Amino acid sequence: MIDKKIFEKFDLLPFSPSRLNAYRDFPCGFVMRYIYGYDFPASPPMIRGSAIEYGFNFYFTDGYSLDECIQKAFNYYDDGTKFTLDEDKKIKERAFIEPMLNLIYPELSKTNSKYLGYQMQVSTEILGIPFSGFTDYAFENDERITVIDLKTKGKLMKKHSDMLQQAIYKKALEEQYKKPVDVRILIVTPKKIDYVDIDDTKNLMKEIEMSLISCANMIKICKKKESLSSLITPNLDDWQWSDADKRSAREVIWGI
C-alpha cells in the first residue's frame, strides 16, 4: 500500500489513468501539467477525436442519423478550433471527421446491448491510491458490461498506454457492477477500422502498480516542485516538444 499523503503533497488525488500514463510516457509533461499547473490548449487532432465521440453519441441518446452525427461533430470541432493558429493543420484534421464517422457509425450502431452512457465517471483504488476516470461508450447485457474506447488516429496502431487505461476501467466497473467487464479499443483511421481486445489485464495491472510505486517514490523525496523537476531531464528530441507552448514551459522550468 502507498501512503496517500505522498500524492496529496502536490494535490494529485484522485489520480487518473492519464496522469499515470503521462508519468510513464512523457515525464516532463507530467511535471509541467500536474506539478506546475500548466494547462496546454488541445491540439487539432485531440479536438477532432473529441468531436467525433461527441457527435456519434447523439446516435445513442437521440437516434441521430449518420449525417446528423457528422454535423454535430463539425460544429464541435469548429467551435473548439476557433483560435487555432495553424490553419493547414486545422483544415486537415477537419477533413478526417466525415470518413471516420462513416466507418464508426455502422460498426457501433449494430449493438443490441443496453447503452449505459458516454463519459461515465468510474472510481477505484490501486494500492490504496484513489483513481478516477471517464469511459467512452459503455454497454450492458444480462451477462456482462462492455466498454468500447474509441481512438481516432492517423495510423492503425495500438498504444500500450491505452491498454493500461482500459485495465483500470475494467477493475473499476467490475467493482461497481459486480459482473464481468470486457474492454475493447476501437481504432479508426480515415480509411480503416479495427478492434483491439484486451483479454488478460492481470499483467497490465501489475505494470500499473509498479509504475505507481515508482511515481510515489519519486514524489516522496521531494518537498517542493523544483526538487521534483530537477529529477527529470528533458529529452529535446521528443516529438512532444513540437508544441510551442510546451517549449515555453520547458524554458521556464528547466531553462532549456
What are the residue ranges of the model-derived segments?
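Short amphipathic alpha-helical segments and their helix-coil junctions
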Residues: 7-12, 16, 27-39, 80, ...
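Nuclease catalytic cores
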Residues: 20-65, 119
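Short, surface-exposed beta-strand-loop junctions and turns on beta-sheet-rich folds
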Residues: 38, 153-156, 202
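Hydrophobic (often cysteine-bearing) scaffold residues that line and stabilize catalytic clefts
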Residues: 44, 48, 93, 97, ...
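A non-catalytic, helix-rich entry segment at domain boundaries
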Residues: 55-120
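Non-catalytic protein-protein interaction segments used by genome-maintenance enzymes to assemble
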Residues: 117, 122-168, 176
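Metal-dependent nuclease catalytic regions and adjoining charged, substrate-binding loops involved
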Residues: 127, 174-256
